[in-house]
Design a protein with these regions (language model features):
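Soluble accessory domains appended to multi-pass membrane transport proteins
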Residues: 1-102
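Solvent-exposed, non-transmembrane regulatory segments of membrane-associated proteins
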Residues: 75, 85-86, 93-170
Length: 170
């Protein structure tokens, strides 16, 4: 119980398992914060055989999240990445995850042949037509994702308002 799953476009936390069906407390999609909307969705057990089942919490309690931060082409990329990485690494939720993951990664690699060499937050860089896209990638518990993202965005905006970084504006 309480696994976060997705099946047939329904995302939710399993709250009841019965003989013929199971119930999930539905959450919104990633674009809408993946937070509970209060609806209980009854899903027939037959869906397990008809649709792909994504379990967000079976192998690990944490999933990889990505936030896209756009900056202008003339921005100081390395300085901006350093500031954002410091913000992410200082987040209280994210800070403790790599230490907690060591045993989970070892256990999962035995059962699922999953290997992760890098559990710490990282930023990837891509140049688009008129701006630079920084893809900030970090581990987070699915139920804490929105709060963590909110905290990171507030701190990024503070750095922008204090003129320490430049954000791309269309």
């Amino acid at each position: 119980l309480e696994d976060r799953i997705e099946i047939n476009d329904v995302i939710g936390d399993v709250v009841v398992i019965n003989l013929l069906s199971f119930k999930v407390l539905e959450v919104s999609d990633k674009e809408n914060g993946e937070q509970s909307n209060g609806k209980i969705v009854n899903i027939p057990n037959s869906y397990i055989f008809s649709y792909a089942l994504k379990n967000y919490t079976t192998a690990f309690k944490y999933i990889w999240d990505e936030m896209i931060v756009n900056i202008p082409l003339n921005a100081d990329v390395e300085k901006t990445k350093k500031i954002i990485l410091k913000i992410v690494n200082n987040n209280e939720v994210i800070k403790a995850i790599p230490q907690k993951m060591d045993k989970q990664v070892t256990d999962a690699s035995l059962e699922y042949r999953i290997y992760y060499n890098h559990l710490e937050p990282i930023i990837y860089t891509r140049v688009n037509n008129n701006h630079i896209e920084l893809s900030v990638r970090f581990l987070v518990h699915p139920k804490k994702m929105r709060n963590v993202e909110n905290d990171i965005w507030i701190k990024i905006l503070n750095e922008y308002q204090n003129k320490k970084i430049t954000l791309y504006k269309e």
